[in-house]
């Protein structure tokens, strides 16, 4: 998307505090062997994460020149209220962190990987190129990923649990579509009550000794345009009349196309990516905006 190649990212400065609310234990990993000899992937091994989440309270922000889509039109509100399915990005949307950046920092390569993430989310490099480059910088082993999941429970964005609960109460299906890793998203889905079959994400691959081998390139979310294909696949399979995509990055915006999402809502409560926000149907900084509009 050429219009996004010069996207500027404005980090949203938010204080963070841990919450003491507890969630039911859930499994997050499982070893799965692939037909290719020596290839192993982790999926749902019964390893417990401490059920602790974190929340942020965003400061009031200036509109930064996006007044036109901060207040939604009647047409946009009607679309939102008529959706039958909502697809969420995960990193910097459902969760306050970029998962791959956090894993890289845990493995000692945080700064270099974060720079690649900014380029990928702004749309200045193909997503598959950025994904491969980032993983090559730290090559996480199976044991390191397991350790990370044990020590770093998901940190959810404020209001996301309430929004998902509201959507589900209104019989609206919820999906997670992410360029991140399924191993790190499964726990998030468990907290939110989202079925595993409603997750579209990448998968890390490991050898028999737990060494890093790469990622599954057959996943649509492993390449540019993949989120759009995932949304189109969902729509075709479930015959939804109206769908929305909520996220912060260029790959989320791409999901709004014929046969895909009818509505793109840019969530800028963590990162404001200006070119993405400017092209959104609706720009929000808090999920409460969406919750209240459903009443």
Curated annotation (Swiss-Prot):
GO BP terms = embryo development ending in seed dormancy; L-serine biosynthetic process; L-serine metabolic process; pollen development; root development; sulfur amino acid metabolic process
Spell out the molecular function terms from Gene Ontology.
L-phosphoserine phosphatase activity; magnesium ion binding
Record EC number: 3.1.3.3
Location within or outside the cell: Plastid, Chloroplast
The gene name on file is PSP
Recorded protein name is Phosphoserine phosphatase, chloroplastic
Without the gene, what phenotype results?
A: Embryo lethal when homozygous.
Q: What does this protein do, in the record's words? A: Catalyzes the last step in the plastidial phosphorylated pathway of serine biosynthesis (PPSB). The reaction mechanism proceeds via the formation of a phosphoryl-enzyme intermediates. Required for embryo, pollen and root development. May be required preferentially for serine biosynthesis in non-photosynthetic tissues.
Name the source organism.
Arabidopsis thaliana (Mouse-ear cress)
What GO cellular component term, any one, is given?
Answer: chloroplast
How does its record describe regulation of its activity? Approximately 60% inhibition of PSP activity is observed in presence of 10 mM serine.
Q: Give first and last residue of the transit peptide.
A: 1-54
InterPro entries recorded? HAD-like_SerB (IPR050582), HAD-like_sf (IPR036412), HAD_sf (IPR023214), PSP (IPR004469)
Superkingdom of origin: Eukaryota
Its pathway is: Amino-acid biosynthesis; L-serine biosynthesis; L-serine from 3-phospho-D-glycerate: step 3/3
The protein's required cofactor(s) are namely: Mg(2+)
């Amino acid at each position: 998307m050429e219009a996004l190649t010069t996207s500027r990212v404005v980090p949203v400065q938010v204080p963070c505090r841990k919450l003491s609310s507890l969630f039911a234990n859930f499994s997050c990993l499982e070893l799965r062997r692939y037909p290719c000899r020596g290839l192993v992937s982790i999926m749902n091994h019964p390893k417990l994460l401490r059920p602790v989440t974190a929340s942020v309270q965003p400061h009031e922000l200036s509109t930064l020149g996006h007044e036109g889509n901060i207040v939604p039109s009647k047409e946009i509100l009607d679309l939102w209220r008529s959706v039958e399915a909502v697809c969420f990005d995960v990193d910097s949307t459902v969760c306050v962190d970029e998962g791959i950046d956090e894993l890289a920092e845990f493995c000692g390569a945080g700064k270099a990987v974060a720079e690649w993430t900014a380029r990928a989310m702004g749309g200045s490099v193909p997503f598959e190129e950025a994904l491969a480059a980032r993983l090559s910088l730290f090559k996480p082993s199976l044991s390191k990923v397991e350790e990370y999941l044990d020590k770093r429970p998901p940190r959810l964005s404020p209001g996301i649990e309430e929004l998902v609960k509201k959507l589900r109460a209104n019989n609206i299906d919820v999906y997670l579509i992410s360029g991140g890793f399924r191993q790190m998203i499964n726990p998030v889905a468990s907290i939110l009550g989202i079925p595993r079959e409603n997750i579209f994400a990448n998968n890390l691959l490991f050898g028999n000794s737990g060494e890093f081998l790469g990622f599954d390139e057959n996943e649509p979310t492993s390449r540019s345009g993949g989120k759009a294909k995932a949304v189109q696949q969902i729509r075709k399979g479930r015959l939804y009349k109206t769908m929305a995509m909520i996220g912060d990055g260029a790959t989320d915006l791409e999901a709004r196309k014929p046969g895909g999402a009818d509505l793109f809502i840019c969530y800028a409560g963590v990162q404001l990516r200006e070119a993405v926000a400017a092209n959104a149907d609706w720009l929000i900084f808090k999920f409460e905006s969406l919750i209240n509009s459903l009443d």
